[in-house]
Amino acid sequence: MLNSRLTVTLTLIVATVIVVSIVGVGLGVVSSVRGGFMNRIIDLLSWLGLAVPNFWLGLVLVSTFAVTFHVFPALGLTAFSSSPVGWLKSLVLPVIALAAAPIAVVMRQTRDAMSNVLEGEFIRTLRASGLTERSIVMRHALKNASLPVVSVLGVLLVSLLGGTVIVENVFAIPGLGSLAVSAVSAHDLPVVEGVAVYFTLIVIVVNLFVDIAYGLLSPKVRVR
């Protein structure tokens, strides 16, 4: 029972991390490079992402896109083996609800890190050498700005575990989060302990991957 629930929760977390990494880093890079009106729009979106609770956002998404427009399923998670398209559609709303606040955090961290890197002396040297701005940003500045972003992603991954408890219950997804709530309500201590062990293992693995990513991105922090 726990293994099948773990697969569902990991699917939700991995999908959310992918969305947060792509959208959050992308918006942060755009905001640091362009500024102006675009920066204000992205700032507004980030404030909204931080201000809106994920359970409220989940209810609004279900009411709008599932109940009113019937675009996405309201509840549950379709098995990938039965329908890959249905599986993907059933992930969209819970991932959006879970990713809104982390996207805002990653975007702000990326923007600040990129702004600091783009003011560095080596960036002026690269510009003087004739490299295009796109090449400077994507190949050099982003890599140097990625270390603090990876740190934030590691912290957010741990906080996402708490978010899954709420989102899984809002969308009736059969994962570890909804199982934990049911077990607490039923005073089922062995199941609660099992869920806690799985969550602890996830945190340990996440920290391990963050350390590995640090070593890949910066040779200075590699353990000899």
Feature-to-residue mapping (PLM):
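Alpha-helical transmembrane segments of integral membrane proteins
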Residues: L2-M38, S82-R224
